[in-house]
């Protein structure tokens, strides 16, 4: 889904003043990341999109994914976003459980994801 091009262009859409890219460091090692970017072409006004929530295997099970997701949602509030959207897949069970705990709810697709088993979620901020 364009990951290599996105990586080469960092910070890209995740840059300030409308986006954020967070890295979690543990003893100087990058343990995880999460990003937020504006999404102006969705049917939701003043929305942002959470992307690239990832925790390296050695650092999983310590709540780091939750901390990153919560920090991105807090950043969305600071940036004045009304809601945060995301997409995830069937096999990302731990992530889907986390999103549900954070208040995300399933919504109709806000863009075309060619991967089977895609789910589209939204949480209201504020």
What spans do the regions from the language model cover?
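Hydrophobic alpha-helical segments, especially transmembrane helices
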Residues: 52-53, 61, 97
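Acetyl-CoA-dependent GNAT
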Residues: 1-51, 56-57, 69-71, 75, ...
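Active-site acidic-Proline motif in GNAT/NAT acetyltransferases
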Residues: 56-58, 62, 90-91
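Conserved G/P- and acidic residue-centered "switch" motifs that form tight phosphate/ATP-binding loops
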Residues: 28, 63, 80
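Residues forming the Rossmann-fold NAD(P)(H) cofactor-binding site
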Residues: 62, 66, 70
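C-terminal "cap" of GNAT-fold acetyltransferases
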Residues: 82-102, 106-126
